[in-house]
Amino acid sequence: MTTRGKTSFILAGAAVLFLALAPGSPAQENSHRGDFAFMTTASEEMPLSDGHVLMRVVQSGMIFADDPASPIDRTATTCSGSTVMEASARATVISGHCDGVDADGDVWTIWYAGDQDGGDWGYMGGTGKFEGIKGGGTFSAEAQWSDGRGINAWEGTYTLR
């Protein structure tokens, strides 16, 4: 093999190695929406000095995305949060966090904040396929039953690494 041939071979090999080690294409932002159907599994109330009530709740349920390709579709989800309620029972402040576990055992986590009508949420992180997830969106309360069941609608964006 000539010197020129060896040089071309080495450069071609280096190019293949560079491409193999280069990070993948830039992550793409995707949209998704759906519902969170839940049941309140724990709740406690604490009267506050100004007549408001602090309610701490744990809710468990399932995420149903409108598009089955959404990575969080059909994830078992648990949320823990606090709600400040007026004497009229109107929720003025709602905040907390949720974690979802998919069929593969990968976990995503979000924060949320709003009032009884809805609010904002955002991804905090995750494991496995959700490691490095970014994004967020909005939610709204759709239905609440007196036995602790409910449905919240959500929409937002996500970017996976």
Regions found by a protein language model. Give the residues of each.
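Glycine-centered signal
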Residues: 2, 24-25
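Beta-strand-enriched cores of mature, soluble protein domains
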Residues: 26-161
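Generic N-terminal simple sequence motifs
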Residues: 19-22, 67
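Bacterial N-terminal signal peptides that target proteins for export
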Residues: 2-11
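Bacterial N-terminal signal peptides
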Residues: 11-20
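General helical secondary-structure elements
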Residues: 1-2, 52
